Amino acid sequence: MRIALAPMEGLVDELLRDLLTRVGGIDWCVTEFVRVCDRLLPVAQFEKLAPELRHGWRTRAGTPMHLQLLGSDPACLAENAALAAELGAPAIDLNFGCPAKTSTARGADGCCSTSRNCCMPSSARCAGPCRRCAGDRQDAPGVRPARGRPGVRRALVEGGVAHLVVHARTKVEGYRPPASWEWLARVREAVAVPVYANRKSGRRRIGCREISGVEDVMLGCGLVSRPDLARQIAMRAPDARSSRRAGVRYSRWCASSGGAPGSGSRRATPLAGSSSGWACWRAVIRRRPRCSPNCAGRTTAGGWMPCWA
């Protein structure tokens, strides 16, 4: 079984990818989606969202990272995929739509998720310059997964994708449970490439596996709220200390960055002191503020700590 870290825009940046992959259990991760409109993007845009490209497209823990593209112009997608391949990207992830409103609002996934003739050249041309192309997609906005979607997936496979990541939810359904895992089983039967179940959390994972027959998963919010979830699933070995260490590294990074609460940067929030690894990490994610905008915390024998610890 393989476990991937979901590319949640505005949350999973290079810092969280580094921290989560250090805990262990994650086989590969994906960047936040790079929006492709009508032109070839500058290299700086790729470096901004994928700074790991300077280190061989791997996190500091050595976890491979894929580059995700979002757009509706197959030719422009192919052009940017070729540039990413020149920069050394090991795989291109084509986002054909996910339940996130920012992904489906502008029709970025429209032609790719509903038109067989459109998604084929897009995926094939993107797969050409790179070693392989991965498809991360959802069903057509507002349409139940039953209606013709396995045919679209077959078209993607014919275009050269190496695996498919399926949300099993529509735009209207969003992230509300339950997901249509029975249609994930139909997709798995229709294609000859690995299929991943894109899950919000690790809860009821066995139910998803039993219904769909899919072993591989992509985890999002569940990994952010519990950093050792992938490790626990893969090795059946919960490790709260790893989560606590990740939170401490996050706090030290915040202290060295000099950010202040309210600046719009998630990174400006330090770690709340606690004896529980999960409480530590959740305090980080919930953006617990400092006592004042100019508070720099305090230095103790154990290192930097926030003022209230």
Curated annotation (Swiss-Prot):
Natural source organism: Azotobacter vinelandii
PROSITE patterns for this protein: UPF0034 (PS01136)
Domain of life: Bacteria
The protein's name: tRNA-dihydrouridine(16) synthase
Family stated for the protein in its record: Belongs to the Dus family. DusC subfamily.
GO molecular function, a single term: tRNA binding
NADP in keyword set: yes
Keywords: Flavoprotein, FMN, NADP, Oxidoreductase, RNA-binding, tRNA processing, tRNA-binding
Catalytic activity: 5,6-dihydrouridine(16) in tRNA + NADP(+) = uridine(16) in tRNA + NADPH + H(+); 5,6-dihydrouridine(16) in tRNA + NAD(+) = uridine(16) in tRNA + NADH + H(+)
Required cofactor names: FMN
Pfam families, sorted: Dus
UniProt keyword Nuclease present: no
Entry EC no(s): 1.3.1.-
Residues reported to bind FMN: 7-9, 68, 137, 198, 220-221
Site (Interacts with tRNA): 35, 95, 175, 267, 286
Described function: Catalyzes the synthesis of 5,6-dihydrouridine (D), a modified base found in the D-loop of most tRNAs, via the reduction of the C5-C6 double bond in target uridines. Specifically modifies U16 in tRNAs.
Enzyme type, top EC level: oxidoreductase
PANTHER family for the chain: TRNA-DIHYDROURIDINE SYNTHASE, TRNA-DIHYDROURIDINE(16) SYNTHASE
